[in-house]
Regions:
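Cys-based phosphatases of the PTP/DUSP/CDC25 superfamily and their flanking regulatory architecture
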Residues: 1-241
Length: 241
């Protein structure tokens, strides 16, 4: 940690960042799938497209013949353990079904939502992809999602959902942790609450099994997720606590 602080103070950390090769970011041939005409409407932003080789691939269905969703696999090795994440954009009304298919197909038990609310500045930044009340059940083409518990903390909410097939067969319980103090256009104003949130996420993830992917989303799928993954892995490496 002291070495990193020294790099920040001297500015050398910025030189390291500038030295990162830009070839992948500037090579449009590496993300063709998301630009196909049948997939364009499944992207929240036209300029935020997953790489073809790391994108999450769903089983093709009639409603989505390409099996496309704007989401990417992220794997980080810490010592002898590989931690898996899926970084994705917030669901659109069109992609709610695919979002839950992704959860089912990738054996996901933990979902992290880095969005304070579904609406911001009179604009929907996330579709309502889960029920907010126990008496309400979300039904998609293939699944039923039921809220079974909710704990409201100072800056985050912990929910648990039961996921069923449409004919009532139980698939799994999904833990959902929403950080409510993150404005879509700003960093959190207070760091400790976010650290507490990440610690809670890590605790829940250990309960369900750290080797299973953790799904993380904000609005675009590229900013807040990286902060969460980096913070979690830094904590795992004992860089911060």
């Amino acid at each position: 940690l002291s070495e990193f602080i020294l790099k920040v103070e001297t500015g050398s950390v910025y030189d390291e960042f500038d030295s990162i090769p830009l070839c992948r970011m500037t090579n449009n041939n590496l993300f063709q799938d998301g630009r196909l005409s049948e997939n364009i409407e499944r992207n929240r932003f036209p300029d935020v497209i997953p790489y073809d080789d790391t994108r999450v691939r769903l089983i093709p269905v009639k409603e989505n013949l390409q099996g496309y969703i704007n989401a990417s696999h992220v794997k980080i090795r810490i010592q002898n353990t590989i931690y898996s994440y899926i970084a994705t954009e917030s669901p659109l009304p069109l992609t709610i079904y695919d979002f839950w298919r992704m959860i089912s197909l990738n054996n996901i038990h933990v979902v992290v939502m880095l969005i304070g609310d579904f609406i911001e500045n009179d604009h929907q930044i996330c579709a309502r992809y889960f029920p907010l009340k126990k008496e309400n059940i979300l039904r998609t083409n293939e699944f039923e999602i039921e809220l079974i518990s909710e704990q409201i903390r100072v800056d985050f909410i912990i929910r648990h959902f039961r996921m069923y097939t449409i004919n009532g067969q139980r698939i799994r319980t999904v833990a959902h942790l929403q950080y409510t103090a993150w404005d879509d256009n700003q960093l959190p104003l207070e760091c400790q609450s976010f650290i507490d949130f990440v610690n809670e996420v890590d605790c829940v993830r250990r309960y369900y099994g750290e080797t299973n992917p953790c799904l993380v989303h904000c609005t675009a799928g590229i900013e807040s997720e990286h902060t969460k993954c980096a913070k979690s892995d830094a904590r795992t490496s004992n860089v911060i606590s």
